[in-house]
């Protein structure tokens, strides 16, 4: 069984939560819970409220995601 491709969407960080989790509002108005990807943790990339980010969502659970890029 082939793994389905993740969905990439743009959003803005609303609030930081414990354990490197963030509440992100997507461009379409939906709010998701997102965590930082491993590479971003390794390179100590800081994410603050108001930052524009790219979020990767699983097609199986559209309420949770992974932050994969922070736009300047």
Swiss-Prot record:
A Gene Ontology molecular function term of the record: ribosome binding
Domain of life: Bacteria
Listed SMART domains: S1 (SM00316)
Matching Pfam families: eIF-1a
Gene Ontology CC entries for this record: cytosol
Keywords: Cytoplasm, Initiation factor, Protein biosynthesis, RNA-binding, rRNA-binding
Domain S1-like as annotated: residue spans: 1-72
Free-text function comment from the UniProt entry: One of the essential components for the initiation of protein synthesis. Stabilizes the binding of IF-2 and IF-3 on the 30S subunit to which N-formylmethionyl-tRNA(fMet) subsequently binds. Helps modulate mRNA selection, yielding the 30S pre-initiation complex (PIC). Upon addition of the 50S ribosomal subunit IF-1, IF-2 and IF-3 are released leaving the mature 70S translation initiation complex.
Record's subunit section: Component of the 30S ribosomal translation pre-initiation complex which assembles on the 30S ribosome in the order IF-2 and IF-3, IF-1 and N-formylmethionyl-tRNA(fMet); mRNA recruitment can occur at any time during PIC assembly.
Family: Belongs to the IF-1 family.
Protein name: Translation initiation factor IF-1
Organism: Syntrophus aciditrophicus (strain SB)
Lineage of source species: Bacteria, Pseudomonadati, Thermodesulfobacteriota, Syntrophia, Syntrophales
Gene: infA
């Amino acid at each position: 069984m082939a793994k389905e491709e993740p969905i990439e969407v743009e959003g803005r960080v609303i609030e930081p939560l414990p354990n490197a989790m963030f509440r992100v509002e997507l461009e379409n108005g939906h709010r998701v819970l997102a965590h930082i990807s491993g590479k971003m943790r390794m390179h100590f990339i800081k994410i603050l409220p108001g930052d524009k980010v790219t979020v990767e969502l699983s097609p199986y659970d559209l309420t949770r995601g992974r932050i994969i890029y922070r736009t300047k």
